[in-house]
């Protein structure tokens, strides 16, 4: 009898607990945030699932497309990365987010188009990002919030490479100079004569050196 009353008491306590507990459902923001945790841990297939769920929950959730784009990049599906980024660029910023998601998307588009050898598009998106961050009142930089080793200097070196591929050596040299000044503000101007084959070869070698230096930093 006592055993039966104990079971009945436990049963009623469980009913009260279930009735009182507030139901919690993951939002698109929760899903994207967890996707970024997985991304930062290198779990790209899993992060893909969470970012996909995020935009299924809300087709206008910008950071979900942003996460998908960067994840596709890690999975070396660059065409899909571009598509995700381009969709994300049309979506509104989440007012609760501190970081400007459009900046991350523009950087992602710059890197993806450069890897695809779409140099004109890489220049378009990269120049757009550099212009936007230079309008900042404070520090005129960009750092990818989910990997601090990726920043505006990587955008500059990508632009230097794409401008070189487009035979615009003056612009290419300008981006190289911006990187060198950022790394050492006291350094003298780095000048080469890009009207000569020797000068262009020197510029190409410097771009390659800076790419390797930034990757190793």
Q: What spans do the regions from the language model cover?
A:
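Terminal, low-structured helical/coil segments at or just beyond the last alpha-helical repeat
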Residues: 149-150, 157-161, 165-217
């Amino acid at each position: 009898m006592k055993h039966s009353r104990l079971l009945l008491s436990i049963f009623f306590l469980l009913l009260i607990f279930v009735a009182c507990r507030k139901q919690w459902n993951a939002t698109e923001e929760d899903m994207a945030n967890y996707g970024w945790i997985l991304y930062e841990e290198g779990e790209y297939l899993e992060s893909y699932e969470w970012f996909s769920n995020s935009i299924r929950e809300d087709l206008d959730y910008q950071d979900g497309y942003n996460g998908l784009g960067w994840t596709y990049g890690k999975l070396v599906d660059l065409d899909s990365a571009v598509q995700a980024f381009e969709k994300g660029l049309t979506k509104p910023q989440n007012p609760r987010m501190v970081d400007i998601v459009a900046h991350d998307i523009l950087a992602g588009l710059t890197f993806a188009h450069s890897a695809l050898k779409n140099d004109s598009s890489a220049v378009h998106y990269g120049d757009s990002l550099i212009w936007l961050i230079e309008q900042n009142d404070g520090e005129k930089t960009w750092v990818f919030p989910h990997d601090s080793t990726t920043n505006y200097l990587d955008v500059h070196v990508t632009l230097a490479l794409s401008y070189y591929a487009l035979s615009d050596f003056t612009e290419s040299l300008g981006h190289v100079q911006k990187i060198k000044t950022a790394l050492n503000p006291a350094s003298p101007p780095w000048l080469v004569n890009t009207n000569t084959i020797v000068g262009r070869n020197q510029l190409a070698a410097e771009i390659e050196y800076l790419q390797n230096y930034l990757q190793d930093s």
